[in-house]
């Protein structure tokens, strides 16, 4: 049943071409915009408070990524979340580097508190830090394994009413009463910058067509990353192949290659 929902969500994104508003970091804007286009969605990078009322009135979802955070960005992010709330739209929070500095940690928590409908997507160290536990981090990279963050993820589900996606060698999608484990992807993927940020952007696209868990996006990127790596000579060709495979992915291939366990 879950597999059918995932494949239907892929078709829905391509048919509906939802607009996804991204307040994201300078490093990954190009990557995430291209990934959204390749999957069939419509990206816009909107950072101004002056246009956010209009943007969130017709956008499908809001993605907040704190990767290049500063004091100018913070009030814009909060205001955007308020407008998403006013329009009943899902907010996807990517707490990049949460735990590496108090600014990142407190900003992430403030956004999580503000959002009415929330999906949190982070690596294990970010999820652990967001929940207030001691995490091992090296900049924005995780030093904790995905399963080490399951307790923290369940806390965030209860605390914020959120769905939580823990990405890593194994991906976990944690919702109230259910945990889904995905075992796709490839060991080369962490060598391409912004791979997690790309997942967060895709999560926004799938949220816009009804997936309020983050499962469909994680399933798609895991399968696509696996396929893209088969012909890749290194991170450069993997990044290029990834866009092609996002564009080419069909329901049958997704269902056939998906490695999923539910508990």
UniProtKB/Swiss-Prot annotation:
Report the InterPro entries cross-referenced here: Hyethyz_kinase, Ribokinase-like
EC class:
transferase
Swiss-Prot/TrEMBL GO biological process terms: thiamine biosynthetic process; thiamine diphosphate biosynthetic process
Residues involved in ATP binding: 121, 167
Keyword presence, Lipid metabolism:
no
- Cofactor dependency: Mg(2+)
Task: Say what the protein does.
Answer: Catalyzes the phosphorylation of the hydroxyl group of 4-methyl-5-beta-hydroxyethylthiazole (THZ).
Q: What is this protein called?
A: Hydroxyethylthiazole kinase
The source organism is Vibrio campbellii (strain ATCC BAA-1116)
């Amino acid at each position: 049943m879950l597999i059918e929902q995932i494949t239907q969500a892929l078709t829905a994104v391509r048919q509906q071409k939802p607009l996804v508003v991204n307040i994201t970091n300078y490093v990954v804007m190009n990557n995430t915009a291209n990934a959204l286009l390749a999957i069939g969605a419509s990206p816009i990078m909107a950072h101004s408070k002056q246009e956010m009322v209009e943007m969130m009135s017709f956008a499908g979802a809001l993605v907040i990524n704190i990767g290049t955070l500063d004091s100018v960005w913070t009030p814009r992010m909060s205001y955007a979340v308020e407008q998403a709330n006013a329009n009943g739209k899902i907010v996807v929070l990517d707490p990049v580097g949460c735990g590496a500095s108090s600014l990142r940690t407190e900003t992430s928590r403030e956004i999580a508190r503000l959002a009415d409908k929330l999906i949190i997507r982070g690596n294990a160290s970010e999820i652990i830090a967001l929940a207030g536990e001691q995490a091992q981090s090296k900049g924005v990279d995780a030093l904790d394994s995905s399963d080490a963050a399951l307790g923290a993820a369940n806390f965030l589900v209860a605390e914020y009413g959120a769905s939580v996606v823990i990405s890593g060698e194994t991906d976990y999608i944690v919702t109230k009463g259910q945990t889904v484990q995905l075992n796709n992807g490839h060991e080369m993927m962490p060598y391409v910058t912004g791979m997690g940020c790309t997942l967060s952007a895709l999560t926004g696209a799938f949220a816009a067509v009804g997936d309020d868990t983050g499962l469909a996006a994680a399933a798609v990127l895991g399968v696509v990353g696996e396929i893209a790596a088969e012909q890749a000579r290194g991170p450069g060709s993997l990044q290029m192949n990834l866009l092609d495979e996002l564009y080419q992915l069909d329901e049958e291939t997704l269902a056939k290659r998906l490695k999923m366990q539910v508990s």
